[in-house]
Amino acid sequence: MSTTFDKVAKIIADTSEIDIDTITPESHTIDDLGIDSLDFLDIVFAIDKEFGIKVPLEKWTQEVNDGKASTDDYFVMKNLCAKIDALVAAKTA
């Protein structure tokens, strides 16, 4: 996961004005890092491009809104990276 984490942290730092050193696996992208929805869309686009996947952001948002998932499930860095790894693995399977 560290490679995925490093890439995602760099994408976040490059896309927003967040210092890469403040991004940890426990960081919540919205609550802790203060990433707004427009920046997050740019970040997701960059993640899609970097990893060759399509992050199902609408599905994740709907699951959170419907109470089927916590925001932590998708937006805490370590969980986001695990989801990205799963999407990459599913694509290559």
Swiss-Prot record:
GO CC, alphabetical: cytosol; membrane
Pfam families: PP-binding
SUPFAM superfamilies reported in the protein's UniProt record: ACP-like
GO biological process: Kdo2-lipid A biosynthetic process; lipid A biosynthetic process
Localization (cell): Cytoplasm
Function: Carrier of the growing fatty acid chain in fatty acid biosynthesis. Is involved in the transfer of long hydroxylated fatty acids to lipid A.
PANTHER family noted in UniProt: ACYL CARRIER PROTEIN (PTHR20863), CARRIER DOMAIN-CONTAINING PROTEIN (PTHR20863:SF76)
Record's protein name: Acyl carrier protein AcpXL
Organism: Mesorhizobium japonicum (strain LMG 29417 / CECT 9101 / MAFF 303099) (Mesorhizobium loti (strain MAFF 303099))
Lineage of the species this protein comes from: Bacteria, Pseudomonadati, Pseudomonadota, Alphaproteobacteria, Hyphomicrobiales
Gene giving rise to this polypeptide: acpXL
